[in-house]
């Protein structure tokens, strides 16, 4: 599945160059985003990657995206509409799109679907991810070295495989650097809600955490950490500009090579 865009784009180019052939139509690729791309976080990283795909393949592909697509029933409607509009490849970039995409994939057997971070597949629906947990491991090492209270706060989104991957990798790195450190986890049950994220960060700091880790999308935890003089990390993109006095490091997700290759 990772090679599909490149293969189809090259096929289109070959058709276009053959003698007497009509100019090939571009490969249409659609992306579903949970939030607006903005300038930070998970969706922003995917939007940068979409732009990389468009720049890399030029007029051989036509990429579009739909933003602010909530997880659940409405996602099914949007996925179905993208398929009806002639998109030959559709990427769903949030975990909650998994079941809606699987359902729609059965009705459009000639369309290729790929669900990011999921685990359910069909004949024309694949899953994909990047090794973000390697960055979490490094975060764990740094957090274990920087904490003075030996208490590290971790704001997790939902109890799903992706979240546990990151949490476990972080814990391994932290314990290697500091066997005495402990993780205090709050499940925010959101991907991006500044109020909930800030409340979670403050609760963890009230309990003695002097490093705040987030697997949520807004800069609210970093800002809360800076306000109270503790360390924090960014999620999915460089967030250092939001809280330069508190920012330790960020896991920066670079999806471009994944989508292109």
Language-model region placement:
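Bacterial N-terminal signal peptides that target proteins for export
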Residues: 1-9
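Bacterial N-terminal signal peptides
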Residues: 9-18
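Sec/Tat signal peptide C-region and signal peptidase I cleavage site
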Residues: 19-24
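A residue-level marker of the well-folded mature domains of exported/periplasmic proteins
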Residues: 25-261
